[in-house]
Amino acid sequence: RKTKVTGSTHCYDSGSIWTENDKEWTVIIPSDEGPQPLGSGGEIVRWVSKNEGKSWKRVGTITSGSERNHGYVRRPLNANEGFYAYWSDGNPDTLSPSRLYFYTKDGQVFQMPYDMSEEWCKPIPYCTEKKK
């Protein structure tokens, strides 16, 4: 069975799927256009199906107004709710910095420090998911 979750602006826009229980599935993907609209990535959005993927509803905008496109959202295996998804950003049109982000199940987004002077550093609060 094929079901369309959403569309995107680039064939390399990729995200991940979570199966919360037998019926509820979550997809987190860069499905909104980002600041570099012709390149891979964009703004990160959360989509949920409560009927095993038969239909999908946009439930939250995780990033918006970003400087660089976000992409390659990944689902950590056996992770806790404080580390629910992670991804990076970058400008696909030119050589640029790339930062790492992670998302908590309750909708908080954190950015990892770009420069680390010690082995351990605190993540930087980045934004909060806007629920739809």
Segment roles from a protein language model:
Residues 1-132:
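Extracellular, repeat-based ectodomains that mediate carbohydrate processing or recognition
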